[in-house]
């Protein structure tokens, strides 16, 4: 007979105890070893967060588009500017807004066919007449704060000498590893392949055509050229 207490446990909606998996955080996400690189480990500050450390080292901790905000710190010259993220891809709406900026232009047409011959664009500070008043093209409302706008001001990103040096070290390390990966490594024959080549040579000598037709010693139907290359490599390793 089934124990009543055990039957209630089976019907209970409470989660069962699971074995703790190593390598996971409390949130269930995989634990990432941020100190896997020796250069980053040497310059890591354990008193700072991951975002602060990566910003100080000149790295990006997240490849997605930036969202939210961060506190701006005051400096001697004003408020420090954050470096622009080179991996951020601007949305199509921003690009479309720049392309479709409204402006007045003059068009020169052919008097006979009516085709457009030339498009004359006025300067930004050119005066145009709107409602009987002459105003500047880039400031039709005569806004006194328009000249103080920061559209033409380019904020200089914060220069971090130590961060730039670390980035250069990481780039050199990545370049060296890339060269070693791209380098062609010679293939070494295994012991079983050497024994197989030895049996072929003992039976057929230099007759590569007979080796290719031998169904017992060559069940995978290797071609004459492939067998010749394997035997040449075997002889070079023995010499």
Curated annotation (Swiss-Prot):
GO terms for cellular component: nucleolus; preribosome, large subunit precursor. The keyword Calcium does not apply. The keyword Nucleus applies. Residues 1-23, 214-239 are annotated as: Disordered. It is found in: Nucleus, Nucleolus. One of its GO terms (biological process) is ribosomal large subunit biogenesis. Residues 229-239 have a biased composition (Basic residues). Transmembrane segments: none annotated. It comes from the Eukaryota. Keywords: Nucleus, Ribonucleoprotein, Ribosome biogenesis, rRNA processing. Belongs to the NOP16 family. Component of the pre-66S ribosomal particle. Involved in the biogenesis of the 60S ribosomal subunit. This is Nucleolar protein 16. The lineage of its organism: Eukaryota, Fungi, Dikarya, Ascomycota, Pezizomycotina. The gene is nop16.
